[in-house]
Amino acid sequence: MAQQRALPQSKETLLQSYNKRLKDDVKSIMDNFTEIIKTAKIEDETQVSRATQGEQDNYEMHVRAANIVRAGESLMKLVSDLKQFLILNDFPSVNEAIDQRNQQLRALQEECDRKLIALRDEVSIDLYELEEEYYSSSSSLCEANDLPLCEAYWRLDPDTDSTDCLSAPLLASPEPSAGGPLQAAAPTHSHAGGPGPTEHA
Amino acid sequence: ATYSLANERLRALEDIEREIGAILQNAGTVILELSKEKTNERLLDRQAAAFTASVQHVEAELSAQIRYLTQVATGQPHEGSSYSSRKDCQMALKRLDYARLKLSEVARTCEQMLEN
């Protein structure tokens, strides 16, 4: 608790230190620049000899130029700190970003589900046609023992002739003990129950 | 287009970074110009004015940014996230993948039947 209360204060001090750094760096840039310009002026000869004066000015300019560069770099660091602070603590934009991302993801999810449902409808119709084809074809007769779908069908009524067997899968599908494929097909049949028989008729 | 608000501020900060570079560049140009035997005063004036303006602009901008941060910062970490919707979305994608897998199985079965 104490730590939580201490946090805002530290943020405050952090921001104040940012402000101080900004002021210091800008002041340093301006001062050093002015001083360099001042040093550039050739002064009257004093007790110090020309050569010594020139050397001193040269050295001073180097130091001041380095100071300007240092201040500039410090400003860069400040900007990068501000960026970090902005990313971590700018709640309005963070909220907005999260909202946008949420919306994006939700839209994607809804699209996926919509497509899945469309796919389900299509596949249920196709499966129905496939099964119809399968039961009315000769392959269902010769390989009846291989496939559980067929097995269930044949077990239910073995003596149906080929014209009746078209509607038989629909009757057989609610059978709970049926094999894997039939179980998978059962919900699609119940779903496509409406259009199924009409198509068939 | 996304994250426009935060991006705008970050972009403003990037501009400031560039401007800091321009400040140093201007200062260098001014001193270089001074070192010449014959100085081009117009150029000197222009560069010096640009230097001062840049410095003031950077200071004002950064002050504004810091002021804005003082307003929005609460000291508490942000607790919102998009994890739940991301998870939902991933689940939806997985559903689709699974459906595709099953469909390909069906297709394979069909092809096998056709071959036989």
Curated annotation (Swiss-Prot), chain A:
InterPro entries: Med22. Residues 93-123 form a coiled coil. GO terms for molecular function: transcription coregulator activity. GO terms for biological process: regulation of transcription by RNA polymerase II. Its main location: nucleus. Keywords: Activator, Coiled coil, Nucleus, Transcription, Transcription regulation. It holds the Pfam family Med22. Residues 166-201 are annotated as: Disordered. One of its GO terms (cellular component) is mediator complex. It is found in: Nucleus. Component of the Mediator complex, which is composed of MED1, MED4, MED6, MED7, MED8, MED9, MED10, MED11, MED12, MED13, MED13L, MED14, MED15, MED16, MED17, MED18, MED19, MED20, MED21, MED22, MED23, MED24, MED25, MED26, MED27, MED29, MED30, MED31, CCNC, CDK8 and CDC2L6/CDK11. The MED12, MED13, CCNC and CDK8 subunits form a distinct module termed the CDK8 module. Mediator containing the CDK8 module is less active than Mediator lacking this module in supporting transcriptional activation. Component of the Mediator complex, a coactivator involved in the regulated transcription of nearly all RNA polymerase II-dependent genes. Mediator functions as a bridge to convey information from gene-specific regulatory proteins to the basal RNA polymerase II transcription machinery. Mediator is recruited to promoters by direct interactions with regulatory proteins and serves as a scaffold for the assembly of a functional preinitiation complex with RNA polymerase II and the general transcription factors. PANTHER family: MEDIATOR OF RNA POLYMERASE II TRANSCRIPTION SUBUNIT 22. This is Mediator of RNA polymerase II transcription subunit 22. It comes from Bos taurus. The gene is MED22.
